[in-house]
Amino acid sequence: MSHAVAPFKRRLRDALESDSLPMALGRVLPLLDGRRREAFHGRDFPAEQARLAAIRKRDVADGPRLLQQFTAVAEKAGMVVHPPADADAVRETVAELLRQASARMVVKSKSMATEEIGLRQALEADGLEVVETDLGEFLVQIADELPSHIVAPALHITRERAAELIGSVTGQDLPPDPDTLVRAAREYLRDKFIAADAGITGANALVASTGSVMLVSNEGNARLCSSLPSLHIVVAGVDKLVATMTDAAATLDMLPASATGQTMSSYVSFISGPSRSADIEMSLSLGVHGPRDVHVVLLDNGREAMRRDPMFQTALQCVRCGACSNVCPTYQQVGGHAMGHIYTGPIGLLLTSFHHGMENVAGPQSLCAGCGACATVCPAGIP
């Protein structure tokens, strides 16, 4: 299934001629980078960067073994792990799981892997109601647009437009006040969480030694998507495989500070199987207060080819923090819709060629100034 991505020249022209985009970028990007600088104040960033880079490099190189280990441990714990596949196969696997569950309504947390393969659009075409529950993704869904930033998908949307978008689905005349808009979105989405037949999330890490899925979020929506419905489907790239909890913790040491300037995100969850209880005579029952069924659907879609490419394998070290976009002088002028395809900003220039083809990266690649600002802030040491 193709993504509804406009031609590069049109996206670039729209960005340069936009009246609202400079306002949105000017409000948010300096704030994000300022928070990142403050979060790392007093820390030895080069040393921490080198440590995470070494861990990510080792785990990427050891990917095939980690895949076998994760699959064995996760399935022993009661999850079903689907082997790595391309975009078409992953979409069909998820659709079939939802058909088998007779699901009609799905809640979804923010996931670049699902954006990469156009999963929501495919499921909607299959007749399902799919609701993005991350506030930024919710705004982008209402606007019928694509995310413009890896961490802040609605970064290009001003608060004034956000009020119009949320009001269009809630039927309210809302002021451009962030707190008011968040409350309105919360009230609207709460019923969706309760009614959902299935929840779809991504993963920030897949821990091979424990068979665990790590989820990191601030809004709490990922936890609701993964715990309220009876079916939880995880869609994750094989690049998310890490060897141990120690390796996952190394990502946690750097990801929140690099992405949002936090010491730690509000919610960190490790999911190691379906909800269970043995409180009645030690007889195991699944599906207590959380899902009865947990499926991990793994995505390759060019990742193994990237892992084997000595020039590009370091791109798999990416932890999806978006810091490179925040300091990129070109991104600061034109945003992610022009400087990117599905994956935006500097890292998107590397990933797009493998995930979506060289034809979709040629235009955005021409915007790179070659200044190297991205490398100075990358927590995983991608040059």
Where are these regions (language model features)?
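The feature marks the mature, well-folded catalytic cores of soluble enzymes
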Residues: 1-310
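A glycine-rich phosphate-binding loop feature that marks nucleotide/adenosyl-phosphate handling sites
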Residues: 89, 266-275, 320, 331-335, ...
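Ferredoxin-type iron-sulfur electron-transfer modules in oxidoreductases and energy-metabolism complexes
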Residues: 286-315, 330-383
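Short, cationic low-complexity segments
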Residues: 313-326
